[in-house]
């Protein structure tokens, strides 16, 4: 059996860290949505008991360091699967960008393996299993727009993000998420209004969504990397209605109602930043798993 499955990137419309927990993680409230910048996974069931990864990108491991490999290994051990799999990944999501590319690939792998290994697991079961690999993966299993709490693994679905244009820009730097969280001072940063963001999404209120964006991690990443702030400022100068860093960075995204203005922001960033994308929100109903 062979199938293919889409693995969309995500952005954080709001990201709040409330306090540091006893287990070392931060208690978070994040409103996230998937976008139509996506990787594509191709899965082939093998009779031989082995996991084979083929990543069409440089600098990405094809062994146990890869979240896809970890997802496959977890399912094999949990359900005593004797079959194998070959997974080919066509990468489009930037690496180490704050867009959950690795987590989305792992989520897509879990969903694809559930099909080709005929495990019969529900989405809820896959999301629960995914939390053993990484905090962001549960959201990526569901896709669409949702509130994530706990350390990011508790997911509450929200209505789809209203239609708009999203311009992404990733500078050629890498950011360490653990380092950013370690240096975050939750008592001294401005916290986003998560309730207002949720209310605006439920009402389909784009202006309310734009006004409610916020990310507590910006205070750390922008201080360490001034180029991230320059990208954000440039987006706003070219007409973005909102601009925000996604995750721990370094990618910044702009939210814009009109195509013409979005194109202006996009053109204003090309040449200023190496990786620039113009995309739309993506909902779970668009997930085309093909056998």
Swiss-Prot record:
It comes from the Bacteria. Its EC number is 2.7.1.148. Signal peptide: none annotated. It catalyses: 4-CDP-2-C-methyl-D-erythritol + ATP = 4-CDP-2-C-methyl-D-erythritol 2-phosphate + ADP + H(+). Keywords: ATP-binding, Isoprene biosynthesis, Kinase, Nucleotide-binding, Transferase. Disulfide bonds: none annotated. ATP binds at residues 94-104. Pathway: Isoprenoid biosynthesis; isopentenyl diphosphate biosynthesis via DXP pathway; isopentenyl diphosphate from 1-deoxy-D-xylulose 5-phosphate: step 3/6. One of its GO terms (molecular function) is ATP binding. InterPro entries: GHMP_kinase_C_dom (IPR013750), GHMP_kinase_C_sf (IPR036554), GHMP_kinase_N_dom (IPR006204), IspE (IPR004424), Ribosomal_Su5_D2-typ_SF (IPR020568), Ribsml_uS5_D2-typ_fold_subgr (IPR014721). One of its GO terms (biological process) is isopentenyl diphosphate biosynthetic process, methylerythritol 4-phosphate pathway. The active site is at 10, 136. Pfam families: GHMP_kinases_C, GHMP_kinases_N. Belongs to the GHMP kinase family. IspE subfamily. NCBIfam families: ispE, PRK14608.1. Catalyzes the phosphorylation of the position 2 hydroxy group of 4-diphosphocytidyl-2C-methyl-D-erythritol. HAMAP family: IspE. This is 4-diphosphocytidyl-2-C-methyl-D-erythritol kinase.
């Amino acid at each position: 059996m062979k199938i293919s499955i889409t693995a969309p990137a995500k952005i954080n419309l709001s990201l709040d860290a409330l306090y540091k927990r006893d287990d070392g993680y931060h208690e978070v409230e994040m409103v996230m949505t998937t976008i139509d910048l996506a990787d594509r996974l191709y899965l082939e069931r093998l009779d031989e008991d082995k996991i084979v990864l083929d990543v069409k990108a440089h600098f990405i491991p094809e062994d146990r360091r890869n979240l896809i490999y970890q997802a496959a290994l977890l399912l094999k051990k949990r359900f005593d699967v004797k079959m194998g799999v070959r997974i080919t990944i066509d990468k489009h999501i930037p690496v180490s960008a704050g867009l959950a590319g690795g987590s989305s690939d792992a989520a897509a792998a879990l969903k694809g393996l559930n099909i080709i290994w005929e495990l019969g697991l529900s989405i809820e079961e896959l999301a629960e299993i995914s939390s053993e690999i990484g905090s962001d993966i549960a959201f990526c299993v569901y896709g669409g727009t949702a509130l994530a709490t706990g350390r990011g693994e508790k997911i509450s679905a929200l209505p789809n993000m209203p239609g708009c244009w999203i311009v992404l820009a990733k500078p050629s730097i890498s950011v360490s998420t653990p380092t950013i969280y370690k240096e975050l001072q939750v008592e001294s940063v401005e916290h986003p209004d998560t309730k207002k963001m949720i209310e605006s999404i439920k009402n389909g209120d784009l202006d309310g969504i734009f006004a409610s964006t916020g990310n507590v991690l910006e205070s750390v990443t922008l201080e360490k990397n001034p180029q991230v702030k320059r990208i954000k400022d440039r987006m706003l100068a070219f007409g973005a209605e909102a601009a925000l860093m996604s995750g721990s960075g370094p990618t910044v995204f702009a939210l814009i109602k009109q195509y013409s203005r979005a194109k202006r922001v996009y053109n204003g960033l090309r040449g200023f930043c190496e990786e620039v994308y113009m995309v739309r929100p993506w909902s779970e109903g668009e997930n085309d798993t093909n056998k």
